[in-house]
Amino acid sequence: MKESEGIDVKLMDIVRFDKNGLIPAITQDYETGKVLMLAYMNKESLEVTLKERKACYWSRSRQELWLKGATSGNFQEVMQISIDCDADAILLKVKQKGGACHVGYYSCFYRQVENDNSSLSICDKLVFDAEEVYGKSNKK
């Protein structure tokens, strides 16, 4: 697609869902660019996201729509949506309220590999108590 060809193209006309009807969605902090999470969207969740401007995903484990923040209050206000060159991955840039991670961290990518190439260390801040919010331990 040439740069000038994108003007009248609609996202829902070009998006390429996989054989299961899903597309990966990378979510970044709108202001810092920090990667917050990777989730999946189906047609319905993408349509909800476009309409409501709040991130809505498809839960593969529960097989249902997942409005991020509906349980925790940690909503993601969608500021920008991009699609990659193959139209098979979505990028959401959001204003994150609270933490994105269900275990209480700001980002789901809260562990990093150390220089020994095997040890993990915490590299993010805990922003809420998952047991208090969800009523059970979600730590992994």
UniProtKB/Swiss-Prot annotation:
Coiled coil: none annotated. One of its GO terms (cellular component) is cytoplasm. Transmembrane segments: none annotated. Mg(2+) binds at residues 84, 86, 88. Pathway: Amino-acid biosynthesis; L-histidine biosynthesis; L-histidine from 5-phospho-alpha-D-ribose 1-diphosphate: step 3/9. Belongs to the PRA-CH family. This is Phosphoribosyl-AMP cyclohydrolase. The gene is hisI.
